[in-house]
């Protein structure tokens, strides 16, 4: 399923454009209609043709598309575009499963969203700490440590931002996160 659906091809291209535009341009239907995305049939990014699967259309290739659109703007020169956002999900966005001895070995499974990739720097500011992956771009809810510890047999020892992980430049990407947890 490493093909984007037509909707994901359009929305992630437009998101990459809007991530690079000044804040005074409204993010609404009027602005959206000004962007004309050209798509090709039968391409991994474009309009898929049956029987190709689009099972991971909302992540993976979408993250790379967003990063490439933002990088294309950055290639215009100083003051444009964004650096690339982190791809892939680390230990802070993991799936846990097992049996909870506190509840008569009741089975559980859940994806935790406790920490995330830091965001890319822009010409105007440093990266956002809770950016996530490019297709999320900071628009996700973070789980509560306390509720997670009450709900599942896990304990968080630490969640902290790490020093000297932001890169060089006038504006820096968000710092990395260190997370330690277990049963």
Language-model features: locations:
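Glycine/proline-enriched, intrinsically flexible loops and inter-domain linkers
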Residues: 1-183
């Amino acid at each position: 399923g490493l093909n984007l659906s037509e909707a994901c091809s359009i929305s992630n291209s437009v998101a990459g454009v809007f991530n690079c535009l000044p804040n005074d341009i409204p993010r609404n239907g009027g602005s959206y209609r000004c962007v004309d995305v050209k798509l090709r049939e039968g391409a991994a990014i474009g309009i898929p043709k049956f029987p190709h699967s689009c099972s991971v259309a909302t992540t993976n290739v979408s993250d790379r598309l967003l990063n490439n659109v933002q990088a294309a703007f950055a290639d215009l020169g100083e003051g444009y575009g964004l650096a690339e956002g982190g791809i892939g999900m680390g230990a802070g966005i993991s799936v846990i499963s097992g049996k909870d001895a506190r509840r008569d070995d009741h089975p559980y499974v859940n994806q935790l969203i406790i920490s995330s990739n830091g965001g890319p720097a822009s010409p105007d500011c440093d990266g956002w700490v809770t950016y996530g992956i490019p297709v999320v771009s900071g628009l996700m809810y973070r789980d509560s440590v306390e509720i997670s510890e009450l709900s599942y047999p896990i304990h968080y020892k630490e969640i902290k931002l790490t020093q000297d992980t932001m890169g060089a430049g006038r504006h820096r990407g968000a710092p990395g996160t260190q997370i330690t947890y277990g049963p």
